[in-house]
Swiss-Prot record:
GO terms for cellular component: actin cortical patch; endosome membrane; plasma membrane. The keyword Transmembrane does not apply. The gene is END3. Component of the PAN1 actin cytoskeleton-regulatory complex required for the internalization of endosomes during actin-coupled endocytosis. The complex links the site of endocytosis to the cell membrane-associated actin cytoskeleton. Mediates uptake of external molecules and vacuolar degradation of plasma membrane proteins. Plays a role in the proper organization of the cell membrane-associated actin cytoskeleton and promotes its destabilization. Residues 285-392 form a coiled coil. It is found in: Cell membrane; Endosome membrane; Cytoplasm, Cytoskeleton, Actin patch. This is Actin cytoskeleton-regulatory complex protein END3. Residues 231-251 are annotated as: Disordered. The keyword Cell membrane applies. It comes from Debaryomyces hansenii (strain ATCC 36239 / CBS 767 / BCRC 21394 / JCM 1990 / NBRC 0083 / IGC 2968). Keywords: Actin-binding, Calcium, Cell membrane, Coiled coil, Cytoplasm, Cytoskeleton, Endocytosis, Endosome, Membrane, Metal-binding, Repeat.
Length: 393
């Protein structure tokens, strides 16, 4: 059975957007229109929903919606005479492979999950032999190892998917697959398809600690939890990593991933990703929607800055006025870029879109600086007025 083609994913994306998803998910009521139009039997539709709703949250995200549509079309077009009892590996999204494995472990009592005829067998987790003194501190040596693994597996956006580290998992003789999934879920509470650099470093550190006989904790420190629970991953590779929780050094763990690092050498990835790649939607309508929202937020920031300036009872000096003028001109330029993008002239120019997004982030940072500058001037004015009133009394 062929994998999902790019044109097929884009077509499903148009249908998905037409159902007005909330938080990138649609409910059963919204999906029922599409499901019932297929004229399949109710028991078949129910089975399709059960197969597609991998995370069992009663809603379908875009990846799960693609699964639903493909299963429906295979039945309607006669490509399949009946529904499979479980999803084929080529239809399992890479971001949800660990959920499939966990479900199989619950129903079969086994942590074995086979993808593309490659089987990873989990060893028994001997809880009595594990220690509870888990150490969140990442030493410089370990950090260097983690960053090497990250650089070898991250995509062009600085993200790493769960299955892209399969080669590493195979070298961890003391870490069962269930603990690998637990560590991934700890650093990825929002269940994103991929995680950013800070999350990858902590994820690898948890695996390192587990390989050295430390029990994986059930919770992460509050500072890390706030970072990992953000709504949108940060792909800024220049951002400083999270500060260590304590200063205790980690004992000799330099052997972590040595065989894996030797194996990958200078290669970009240890293994090919498993499952369907849904990245075809990047650079299409969804990117335009994001850019449009960013421009709207930028306009709002400029409007607020202008209002604060108007009520400050004093005009900007020449420097701040010039900065504001430059921002407005740059905003106008980026708005024109968006218009061209929507008209189709720049639809396939992902480089220009990336430059526009970077420029928008720069403008937002500069607007923040301008607001802080205006606030400082306002505070100085208020302080001066208070001193004048004090002298008069």
């Amino acid at each position: 059975m062929p994998r999902l083609e790019d044109w097929e994913i884009k077509k499903y994306w148009e249908i998905f957007q037409g159902l007005n998803p909330v938080d990138n998910k649609i409910t059963g009521d919204k999906a029922s229109t599409v499901l019932k139009n297929s004229r399949l039997k109710d028991d078949q539709l129910s089975q399709i929903w059960d197969l597609s709703d991998i995370d069992s949250d009663g809603k379908l995200d875009f990846e799960e919606f693609c699964i639903t549509m493909r299963l429906i079309f295979d039945l309607v077009n006669g490509n399949q005479q009946s529904l499979p009892s479980e999803l084929p590996s080529w239809l399992v999204p890479a971001s949800k492979a660990h959920l499939i494995q966990a479900n199989m472990a619950v129903t079969t009592g086994s942590n074995n999950y086979q993808t593309n005829n490659n089987t990873i067998t989990d060893d028994d987790d001997e809880d009595e032999s594990l220690s509870d003194d888990f150490d969140w501190y990442i030493s410089p040596t370990d950090k260097s190892i983690y960053e090497t693994i990250y650089d070898s597996n991250s995509d062009s956006y600085g993200r790493v998917k769960f299955d892209s580290l399969t080669g590493l998992y195979q070298t961890l003789s003391k870490v069962p697959r269930s603990d690998i999934s637990s560590a991934w879920n700890l650093v990825n509470p929002k269940s994103f398809e991929a995680i950013d650099k800070d999350q990858v470093l902590v994820f690898l550190h948890i695996l390192n600690q587990r390989e050295n006989g430390k029990r994986i904790p059930r919770y992460v420190p509050a500072s890390l939890r706030a970072t990992f629970s953000k709504d949108t991953p940060s792909y800024d590779l220049n951002q400083a990593p999270s500060k260590p929780i304590n200063s205790a050094p980690v004992n000799n763990k330099n052997s972590f991933a040595n065989s894996y690092l030797n194996k990958i050498g200078h290669a970009n990835n240890a293994t090919n990703e498993k499952g369907t790649d849904f990245s075809a939607t990047e650079g299409t309508d969804w990117e335009e929607v994001r850019l449009r929202r960013e421009l709207a937020n930028l306009e709002d920031l400029l409007s607020k800055a202008s209002q604060k300036d108007h009520t400050s009872n004093k005009s900007d000096d020449s420097e701040s006025a010039m900065i504001k003028y430059e921002y407005e001109q740059l905003l106008k330029y980026k708005t024109n870029i968006l218009s061209e993008l929507e008209s189709g002239s720049n639809h396939n120019n992902s480089k220009d879109l990336g430059d526009a997004k970077n420029d928008i982030e720069l403008i937002e940072n500069q607007v923040t600086i301008l607001e802080e500058f205006l606030n400082e001037r306002q505070n100085e004015l208020n302080k001066t007025n208070e001193e004048i009133r004090a002298l008069r009394t």
